[in-house]
A protein has these predicted regions:
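Surface-exposed charge patches
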Residues: 6, 57, 115, 184
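Aromatic sugar-binding surface patches on proteins
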Residues: 23
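Proteolytic processing hotspots in large secreted/extracellular or virion-associated proteins
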Residues: 1-4, 9
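Alpha-helical membrane segments in multi-pass integral membrane proteins
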Residues: 176-188
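Feature responds to low-complexity, polar/acidic, surface-exposed segments characteristic
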Residues: 10-20, 28-54, 61, 66-113, ...
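Short, hydrophobic-biased amphipathic alpha-helical segments
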Residues: 207-214
Length: 226
């Protein structure tokens, strides 16, 4: 699962959504460029025996997921708003979109990807004009970002039986109105699951390992990976 189509961008490879069938790669990419089939295995010492090993290594091989330091992924650390936005942006291969919006509290390694994600309609800032990149992302906001990403990729996001789907979560009344449609869609699509307690836990956080599982399911739902 470490082989994928990649696009040569400058002097580095970026993920090109692609599926393989009997040795043939079908690439879903918005635009032209130089593409190659690349085997790029990645491993992290602290996921060797972790349940997320395949998801983490699969996304890392495509330069979507990334460690916190060389060889260290920290799967049980909570994922931040910046980290999740960057993973979605790279997963959809939209790193070349022109990002022109700069949040006053966004700078550093994730600045370009976050600006790109905003321009693509995947993320929004808060009312005060900030993004709060280092905050732990809430599960309800992950659902909103995922649906925005699916919409960007061409999916029509509608849920006819929203109340019926949400009723399966015992805490469904605590899901904010702005996120209810997104939570229902992600649950129905099997992209974001509820907790073992039958809660959705909308204000709860997710680990970096859980984030890779969600991104991987999103990519399979879009038929962007095998």
């Amino acid at each position: 699962y470490s082989t994928s189509a990649m696009k040569l961008t400058g002097d580095e490879f970026t993920f090109a959504p692609s599926v393989f069938d009997h040795g043939t790669a079908r690439i879903h990419y918005r635009g032209n460029g130089v593409f190659a089939i690349v085997n790029n295995p990645k491993s992290f010492s602290n996921v060797a025996n972790h349940w997320s090993k395949m998801n983490v290594e699969k996304l890392a091989a495509r330069n979507i997921a990334f460690g916190k330091s060389e060889g260290i992924f920290a799967p049980d650390d909570y994922v931040t708003r910046a980290e999740f936005a960057v993973m979605i942006t790279r997963a959809l291969a939209i790193t070349e979109e022109e990002g022109t919006v700069n949040f006053e509290d966004v700078s550093g390694w994730y600045e370009k990807d976050i600006s790109t994600a905003y321009s693509a309609g995947i993320i929004n800032g808060r009312d005060d004009g900030k993004f709060y990149p280092n905050e732990r992302i809430k599960r309800k906001d992950m659902a909103v970002m995922i649906c925005n990403a699916l919409r960007f990729a061409g999916k029509e996001i509608t849920v006819e039986n929203e109340q019926e789907i949400l009723a399966k979560f015992v805490d469904n009344s605590t899901i904010d109105e702005y996120a209810r449609g997104s939570v229902a869609y992600c649950a129905k699509a099997g992209i974001i699951m509820g907790r073992d307690t039958k809660d959705f836990d909308p204000d709860g956080n997710a680990t970096r390992a859980e984030a890779t599982a969600i991104i991987e399911r999103m990519l399979r739902y879009l038929d962007f990976i095998n």
